Amino acid sequence: MPNSLHGKTIAILATDGFEQSELMKPKQALEEAGAKTQVVSPTEKKIKGWDHKDWGKEVAVDIALKSADPAQYDALLLPGGVMNPDQLRMNPDAVRFVKHFFEQAKPVAAICHGPWMLVEAGAVRGRTMTSWPSLKTDIRNAGGSWADEEVIVSNGVVTSRNPDDIPAFNREMIALFSKAAAAGNGKPVQKVA
């Protein structure tokens, strides 16, 4: 992948129970494309991943959510895992953090259960998305359309279903984030009302 994200900083919002591959592989792809990534979490030191059916590895938190300024980031990555977004969506600071990216027309990528945060942030209406199948009703009830596809890009948001989709997810995430970077984040995303 070309280094089209050089000089850009991407927030990765996660907490304990994130799906290991859905954080680590996109993080690596972003860094290979030239971006600086920062893991942002309500937990201050380390968060523990979930690796398919058991606990995975710990990942260092770069900045605590309470200290993170979303204005300092060019884009947002929301990994899945059932526990991770389920906890984050109940955290008002995490929801505000996500809303900022839509209010400021910045691109967002969410995989698997990650789109739960988009539902909570009121950012689904008018978009077509994919996700882990159990989120289909939540997305539709929030005003979005849901499709069972490997990856969907809709109005500044990239979504995918599961870890098997990571290669396509990474490709489209890098393409969207690069396009936004080239445009100076010039309104690629619909603002949240």
Tell where the protein language model's regions lie, with residue ranges.
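Extended, subdomain-level signal for the structured scaffold at the beginning of enzyme domains
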Residues: 1-104, 108, 116-128, 136-193
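Catalytic nucleophile serine of serine hydrolases
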Residues: 112
